[in-house]
């Protein structure tokens, strides 16, 4: 019988480090729920000591997620471990993941320490983490460049101290697959107590071989793989979990292992991460790219028509990509929309039916037929904007021509007030943004603007994603409409609401901190 490979997702911790704009607590919860539905065994959701916001998001996810083990990162520092435990204690069970560098370069130049001191510190911190939970993971940072004898000493000591998972990361993406396999097998040969812990691997894609390294390590005995959906992460990214998962499934004949992942949720989880993180998936991306199952060669097309297995080693359906697209019209009722969402695998908690149906009717009146991809796009926007809005675009009008200066007029609802403004700009989108800035007096700099079609044909929905800089922080906004100028305006209003909510959260955190301080003084 094949052994299980534990899937450890770090999209919300290591993956988030690559994003241009930080995710809100709500956005992180959306991703966490998608990962839970996909069946990841462990999800690393943040570094709680880094900021009050990260602490809050880890705590919220730990309180919500029930079917995956929630994990938080901590350096081998007492405060890190204590804060991680505090953020996770609302969960029924949790993991603390602590780490320290073990390579000669890192020990000498970063830690300015010795291997013996590193081992002593690792032992102390693993034991401290065990005071809070019986699920402790220890990572040897830069293990790929650590001599095997040194690595074996650290691993043996960490296991003796109580670590239940030992992670061997290729921190800088330097190791070749055959080298990585040798490291894993070398540890099995050298560490006498290695059977008391799960050996994990964490790979980076600097040389384009993160997935190959992970699979080589699994073949050599590793039984946990760490990575991120779509391979997102700093520098060249992390190991793409969907690729590892499907490689294990498709090549079970030689891998002789399995995962507990619900493969039919891979596509939707990948799309959720892509859209919320504002990181488009390349068309030629393995498993989840739009071209992953496309065949343009005549010979290939003929072979697929005769037998799909001629050129397809897996089916689109195996990752949850439904190629049968149905359409609804303005005559379709709420029950029909709800039924179609259920057929596509969505749960009622994934969207607000009232809001979705209102948006559906408006779109159906404009374009006649609404397809599955339209519904999914509407549901995504619906989820992003379901919180109460302080700002709302009530009206806009734009005048623009090839030789005219673009002029925009807007009516913006700001809390209990309605404000109107007009402005000129370098094109219709810039004119609207200038008018909005005049209303709010927010000093916003547009950093990135992206437009993507959600569907096919001239009446396809256009999704605009923008990233702005405001007071040294970056915020992401998204808008959706058949009119790209309207999409652009909605994206900026979404940004305004995100800025406003962030300010409200900051006020609440300050209030809690002040109350805590007052309570201390009272005691």
From Swiss-Prot:
All residue ranges annotated as the Pyruvate carboxyltransferase domain in the record: 5-267
Pfam family membership, one: LeuA_dimer
Catalytic activities: 3-methyl-2-oxobutanoate + acetyl-CoA + H2O = (2S)-2-isopropylmalate + CoA + H(+)
Keywords: Amino-acid biosynthesis, Branched-chain amino acid biosynthesis, Cytoplasm, Leucine biosynthesis, Manganese, Metal-binding, Transferase
CDD domains tied to this protein: DRE_TIM_IPMS
Coiled-coil residues: none
Pathway where this protein functions: Amino-acid biosynthesis; L-leucine biosynthesis; L-leucine from 3-methyl-2-oxobutanoate: step 1/4
Annotated PROSITE patterns: AIPM_HOMOCIT_SYNTH_1, AIPM_HOMOCIT_SYNTH_2, PYR_CT
NCBIfam families, per database record: leuA_bact, PRK00915.1-1, PRK00915.1-3
Complex formation: Homodimer.
Descriptive protein name: 2-isopropylmalate synthase
Originating organism: Klebsiella pneumoniae (strain 342)
Gene for this chain: leuA
